[in-house]
Amino acid sequence: MTDELKSYEALKAELKKSLQDRREQEDTFDNLQQEIYDKETEYFSHNSNNNHSGHGGAHGSKSHYSGNIIKGFDTFSKSHHSHADSAFNNNDRIFSLSSATYVKQQHGQSQND
């Protein structure tokens, strides 16, 4: 083998490894974005359920708080809570929506469904 051919083969092997590493990093990134989305859903669902079920907490006590870190706790001291006021929508997802690639990915999946 000539030196040029050896150099070419070494670069080719390095490129293959780099592409494999990139795919693994993209998979890890996608998994992290999905985990963020799932945690947001869990947070909003937990707060929504506690606000309206009348039961919450680890000891089954009644929950009287209302709100979350996104919308605030303005109704904290009010005794009547409106389900419509505390229901969350996708616009509340400040963490997962901050990733342009995740938004594009979700938009592409919804068009394919």
UniProtKB/Swiss-Prot annotation:
GO BP annotation list: chromatin remodeling; DNA repair; DNA-templated transcription
Keywords (A to Z) from UniProt: Chromatin regulator, Coiled coil, DNA damage, DNA repair, Nucleus, Transcription, Transcription regulation
Family classification: Belongs to the EAF6 family.
Family matches, as Pfam families: NuA4
Annotated segments matching region Disordered: 36-64
Origin superkingdom: Eukaryota
Function text: Component of the NuA4 histone acetyltransferase complex which is involved in transcriptional activation of selected genes principally by acetylation of nucleosomal histone H4 and H2A. The NuA4 complex is also involved in DNA repair. Component of the NuA3 histone acetyltransferase complex. The NuA3 HAT complex has 2 functionally distinct forms. NuA3a binds H3K4me3, through the PHD finger of YNG1, and acetylates H3K14 at the promoter region of actively transcribed genes to promote transcription initiation.
Keyword Transcription regulation: yes
Subcellular location: Nucleus
Principal location class: nucleus
Coiled-coil residues: 1-43
Subunit structure: Component of the NuA4 histone acetyltransferase complex composed of at least ACT1, ARP4, YAF9, VID21, SWC4, EAF3, EAF5, EAF6, EAF7, EPL1, ESA1, TRA1 and YNG2. Component of the NuA3 histone acetyltransferase (HAT) complex. The NuA3 HAT complex has 2 functionally distinct forms that participate in transcription. The NuA3b HAT complex contains an additional subunit, PDP3.
Miscellaneous: Present with 504 molecules/cell in log phase SD medium.
Name listed for the protein in its UniProt record: Chromatin modification-related protein EAF6
PANTHER family according to UniProt: CHROMATIN MODIFICATION-RELATED PROTEIN MEAF6 (PTHR13476)
Gene Ontology cellular-component terms listed: NuA3 histone acetyltransferase complex; NuA3a histone acetyltransferase complex; NuA3b histone acetyltransferase complex; NuA4 histone acetyltransferase complex; nucleus
